[in-house]
Curated annotation (Swiss-Prot):
Biological process terms in GO annotation: nucleotide-excision repair; SOS response
Similarity comment: family membership: Belongs to the UvrC family.
Cellular localisation: Cytoplasm
Name of the protein described by the UniProt record: UvrABC system protein C
Highest rank taxon of the organism: Bacteria
Underlying gene: uvrC
Annotated organism of origin: Aliarcobacter butzleri (strain RM4018) (Arcobacter butzleri)
Main location: cytoplasm
């Protein structure tokens, strides 16, 4: 069935549609109140099927590449909106606007249910009337919190109030020892209110920190003074300067988006009780468009607002101010009402103080774009994109390796490089216990398990596989089977005498990639090439992480083997068990009948008794 015939079958229902090119690559995901009307509006059908005349240049180019269309029917437009957002985050279509780094930002919070409340940081929101949240913060949250503890004598650690004796923090005058009842709850509450003032007023916090820094310097405590200096810089960098006070107690969120030079940024500002308390920003991914297209503000705001409010929000605003007029305002308000059972208005103010606030957000967009565009030198990400024909700049990279010893303690590792951190994101590292016996199957098992988690942790921009062309083809087959738009390269040692030598100096690294025409090619770059060195750094970190986890698992296995041998279970029987179950954790959970399929009843009983009574 050709595309024109397929389009004639579109239903009159709400749903989500997907466009694919001639190679089956996903181009675009959209939603519709009536699929038939929306999808057909992209095309004109006479004299032959072609893009409609009134499309924007970006969408016109996309439609000219469309070879097939699929759709999913849902009960209503709201469900279509939610499904569209979920699929875009997971599948990363070429022509959709995406957040460069789709992450959850931290909040500072205080729980007033505690007798002596502390300030702390979290990314998880609990629904509780006793907890007050401040944020979110894209930068500076930890520095701000540490600074407040530096100048306000709050309870320093959770364990402090559980003790019965004043600790070192009391001796150095950083805590007032509520553990010894040296301060009442009422007096301590005033200290907490003082601490919160510094969150509301960062200028006051910075002024106090400068006083403290000067004091440290005069006391020749230069290391502590330098620490405060660095904190001040981070807090200043994160602060949007504004003297605007709405003179009301309104809670308002502000979203502003601007774009130029194939870069786009969103700034979010949060007013609580009429005062600006925090802000965050994200760059949008539009670098994968081949030409300078007119930026689609409608889609950008839709992505930004749905992505943000699809999470748990500690304090819902009365209204959301936006910097541009939107045609989809009613749809977004309906989404917010359904999501939170609360009416939240989206307003594009034209005058007065609310317009001033929106203009501040737009000015900060311009400043962030200016800084981004001032990075004149070609970045490593741009060089990698050009060299390997990547669809997008690889700001978020996942690298994979596996490790085992003679088939024992087989593990896989995934490490993550994040451009916004300019280093490895070790909190995002993952390791896998693998059951497969050969390297090809092990990599397949690991990549499939990673793809299964895309709904929770969306796909990165680039995968780096530790292996050759065979594993690269495997990875492409896997991602294409689920329709994910994802660039992949592989790095392997050059083979000498049919062996790949890892030792330095023995062989060079070869990078394998796939061209736009679907051909698999390779580069043998000079060892001094910074593009090679960057990819090697990713591979080496994945290898280190895999080896470290393998050694840990191997030690645990060796311990189990030794103890089982003491119980009379020989090495040959242990190998049979591992061959059948794959790992000790599964042997430990096996039933008597399952163990009997491998060993005799006596040995099965011995093993069952051993693991029933075993303590780590």
């Amino acid at each position: 069935m050709n595309l024109q015939e397929k389009l004639q079958q579109l239903p009159n229902d709400a749903g989500v549609y997907q466009y694919f090119d001639k190679n089956g690559h996903l181009l675009y995901i959209g939603k519709a109140k009536i699929l038939k009307n929306r999808v057909k509006s992209y095309f004109k059908f006479t004299p032959k099927l072609q893009p409609a005349d009134k499309l924007s240049p970006r969408i016109y180019k996309m439609i000219s590449e469309v070879e097939s269309c699929e759709w999913i029917v849902v009960p209503n437009e709201h469900d279509a909106l939610i499904l569209e957002n979920s699929l875009i985050k997971q599948l990363k279509p070429k022509y959709n606007i995406l957040l460069r780094d789709d992450k959850t930002y931290p909040y500072i919070f205080v729980d007033f249910d505690e007798d002596f409340p502390r300030l702390d940081i979290t990314r998880r929101i609990q629904k509780s009337k006793s907890i007050k949240y401040f944020g979110p913060y894209s930068t500076g949250a930890r520095d701000m919190l540490d600074s407040i503890y530096e100048i306000v004598p709050l309870v320093q650690k959770k364990s402090c109030v559980k003790g019965k004796k004043a600790c070192l923090f009391y001796q150095i005058q950083k805590c007032l020892a509520p553990c010894e009842n040296k301060i009442s709850k009422e007096e301590y509450a005033k200290i907490v209110e003082n601490a919160l003032e510094y969150i509301y007023n960062k200028t006051k916090l910075i002024s106090k920190l400068n006083e403290k820094m000067l004091q440290y310097s005069n006391d020749f405590r230069f290391e502590e003074a330098m620490t405060l200096r660095d904190r001040i810089k981070t807090i200043e960098k994160s602060q949007i300067k504004s003297d605007i006070d709405l003179a009301t107690n309104e809670d308002i969120d502000i979203f502003a988006i601007n774009a130029n030079n194939k870069k786009a940024v969103i700034v979010r500002m949060f007013l609580r009780d009429g005062k600006l308390t925090s802000s965050s920003h994200d760059f949008l991914k539009i670098d994968n468009f081949d030409e300078e297209f007119e930026f689609d503000y409608q889609e950008a705001y839709e992505r930004a607002i749905i992505n943000y409010y699809d999470n748990e929000i500690p304090l819902l605003p009365k209204e959301i101010l936006i910097a541009h007029e939107l045609e989809i305002t009613n749809e977004l308000e309906e989404f917010l009402h359904t999501r939170f059972n609360k009416k939240i208005k989206l307003i594009n103010p034209k005058k007065d103080k609310k317009r001033e606030i929106v203009n501040i957000a737009l000015n900060n967009c311009d400043e962030l774009l200016r800084i981004e565009n001032s990075k004149n030198q070609t970045s490593i990400y741009e060089e990698l994109k050009e060299l390997f024909n990547l669809q997008t700049l690889p700001y978020l990279i996942e690298s994979f390796d596996n490790s085992h010893m003679m088939g024992q303690a087989t593990v896989g590792a995934m490490i993550v490089w994040n451009e916004s951190l300019n280093t490895f994101d070790k909190k995002a590292f993952r390791h896998y216990n693998l059951e497969s016996k050969d390297e090809y199957s092990q990599m397949k098992e690991m990549l499939i398990r990673r793809i299964e988690s895309f709904e929770k942790n969306p796909a990165p921009d680039l995968w780096i596989i530790d292996g050759g062309e065979t594993l690269l083809k495997l990875a492409f087959d896997i991602v294409q089977s689920v329709g994910v738009n994802l660039d992949i390269i592989a790095i392997a040692k050059e083979k000498i005498d049919a062996k790949a030598h890892r030792a330095k100096g023995k062989a060079k690294d070869i990078i394998h990639y796939k061209t736009k025409n679907g051909e698999f090619k390779s580069f043998n770059l000079l060892t001094s090439d910074k593009r090679l060195q960057f990819v090697q750094r990713q591979r080496d970190e994945a290898h280190r992480f895999a080896i470290t986890f393998h050694k840990k698992q191997k030690r645990a296995q060796d311990k189990q083997i030794s103890l089982l041998q003491i119980k009379g279970i020989g090495e040959a029987k242990i190998k049979k068990l591992l061959l059948y179950f794959g790992e000790f954790e599964k042997i430990k959970k096996a039933s008597f009948d399952e163990l009997k399929t491998v060993l005799n009843e006596k040995d099965a009983s011995t093993i069952l008794d051993y693991f029933t009574n075993f303590k780590d």
